[in-house]
Amino acid sequence: LFTRDPSGPLQGWHQTGRLVADVLINTQLRSPQEGRYFVIASHWRLAAALNQSLPQDAPCFWPSPAHPRVHAIQDPSDWSHPFAHLPRYDARQPDGTSLFAQKDALYVTDDSARGSPPPILRAAFARTELLTVVPVIHAGQPVREIKIFACYSYQPPQL
C-alpha cells in the first residue's frame, strides 16, 4: 500500500497484534481447548513484529519460553532467516514426537494478493479457511492489510 508517510509501514503494529489476539480469543470461544492455535506468519519480519506486538495474555499455543509465540513459516531447506534457528513448529522431539502435531494454527499474512496459505502449509494441514481480512489504519491512512487463515490439524513432516 502506498502512503504519503514514509514511516507508515512502521506504524500500526499494536493494532495488528491486538487484531491477531482478538481472532485468537474469538476462535478460542468455539473450542474448549485452551491455547489451541499456534501462530504462523508469512515471513520472518512479520513474525518478529507480531512477537513484539501480540499481547502477553493472547491465548495461543506456546510450548515453552524458548519457542517464539509467533513462528515464521518454515521451509525445511531454508535456514537463511533468524527464525530458522529458534525452536520450530516443524521440529521433532528426540523421541520422534512433535509438540505441534494435531494442533491448529492461525496463518497471518500482509500479502494482500494471497488468496490462500502457500502450498507448503496447505500440505501440512488437513484443511485451511480464510477467517478475516482487515485493513490496518494509522493516522487515517492504510498501512497494511492483514489476512488471517485458520489451518486445521497440523501434520509434521515425515522423518
What are these language model-derived features?
Residues 2-159:
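Luminal/periplasmic acceptor-recognition loop/helix of membrane-associated glycosyltransferases
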